[in-house]
Amino acid sequence: MSYGRPPPDVEGMTSLKVDNLTYRTSPDTLRRVFEKYGRVGDVYIPRDRYTKESRGFAFVRFHDKRDAEDAMDAMDGAVLDGRELRVQMARYGRPPDSHHSRRGPPPRRYGGGGYGRRSRSPRRRRRSRSRSRSRSRSRSRSRYSRSKSRSRTRSRSRSTSKSRSARRSKSKSSSVSRSRSRSRSRSRSRSPPPASKRESKSRSRSKSPPKSPEEEGAVSS
């Protein structure tokens, strides 16, 4: 079957999906292998749009469902071109031709089981959600740590300001007490002597020295 040929009428057929194919496996090779179990209506190998190489899986259509089941039981785990095949029932119908799919809406993926973009999108969404949650958690943690550091710096600045004010108040009180003691000492030094000392000085001044005999004779004459 050549690439780009429009698909045949596959209504009423049973499709098998064959995984783990090599890039050199051709539709004719698959047809010869699967025709041993019944009449094969169609063999389709999806290829890359740009490189035209096989994507590693194929779909084999049988006219009879029982032949498809026999082929699945026999070929699942068989080795073809050095690869162990995985054969299962296909879930979806065959997609339309690529020429028509460009104009219309995107078709369903031919076959099932983890090869389409739809099967990968939930995983990507889960990953993006987990990444967004981890980012939000890291942001909240960073904000919490920032607020903690800010509160610590504020408390430290407050404690340092309190200690500085306490030191200043202590220095002021010590300077005031020193000035008071100095003023008291000066006032004590400048204060007059006591009354007893004054009386003794006045008595000593009032007492005159004793007169000589010459002075006494002059007075008597």
Swiss-Prot record:
UniProt cross-references to SUPFAM superfamilies, sorted A to Z: RNA-binding domain, RBD
Free-text description of this protein's post-translational modifications in UniProt: Extensively phosphorylated on serine residues in the RS domain. Phosphorylated by SRPK2 and this causes its redistribution from the nuclear speckle to nucleoplasm and controls cell fate decision in response to cisplatin treatment. KAT5/TIP60 inhibits its phosphorylation by preventing SRPK2 nuclear translocation. Acetylation on Lys-52 by KAT5/TIP60 promotes its proteasomal degradation. This effect is counterbalanced by HDAC6, which positively controls SRSF2 protein level by deacetylating it and preventing its proteasomal degradation.
Record flagged with keyword Acetylation: yes
Residues with PTM N-acetylserine: 2
Sequence positions bearing N6-acetyllysine: 52
Main localisation: nucleus
Cell location: Nucleus; Nucleus, Nucleoplasm; Nucleus speckle
Keywords: Acetylation, mRNA processing, mRNA splicing, Nucleus, Phosphoprotein, RNA-binding
In-chain residues carrying the UniProt-annotated modification Phosphoserine: 2, 26, 189, 191, 204, 206, 208, 212, 220
UniProt cross-references to CDD domains, sorted A to Z: RRM_SRSF2_SRSF8
Presence of the UniProt keyword Aminoacyl-tRNA synthetase in the record: no
Compositionally biased region (Basic residues): 117-171, 179-189
Domain of life: Eukaryota
SMART domains: RRM (SM00360), RRM_1 (SM00361)
Family matches, as Pfam families: RRM_1
Annotated segments matching region Disordered: 92-221
GO CC terms of this entry: cytosol; nuclear speck
Molecular-function annotations in GO: RNA binding
Residues bearing PTM Phosphothreonine: 22, 25
A biological process from GO: RNA splicing
All copies of domain RRM, residue ranges: 14-92
Quaternary structure, from the entry: In vitro, self-associates and binds SRSF1/SFRS1 (ASF/SF2), SNRNP70 and U2AF1 but not U2AF2. Binds SREK1/SFRS12. Interacts with CCNL1 and CCNL2. Interacts with SCAF11. Interacts with ZRSR2/U2AF1-RS2. Interacts with CCDC55 (via C-terminus). Interacts with BRDT.
Family under the similarity heading: Belongs to the splicing factor SR family.
Task performed by this protein: Necessary for the splicing of pre-mRNA. It is required for formation of the earliest ATP-dependent splicing complex and interacts with spliceosomal components bound to both the 5'- and 3'-splice sites during spliceosome assembly. It also is required for ATP-dependent interactions of both U1 and U2 snRNPs with pre-mRNA. Interacts with other spliceosomal components, via the RS domains, to form a bridge between the 5'- and 3'-splice site binding components, U1 snRNP and U2AF. Binds to purine-rich RNA sequences, either 5'-AGSAGAGTA-3' (S=C or G) or 5'-GTTCGAGTA-3'.
Protein name: Serine/arginine-rich splicing factor 2
Biological source species: Sus scrofa (Pig)
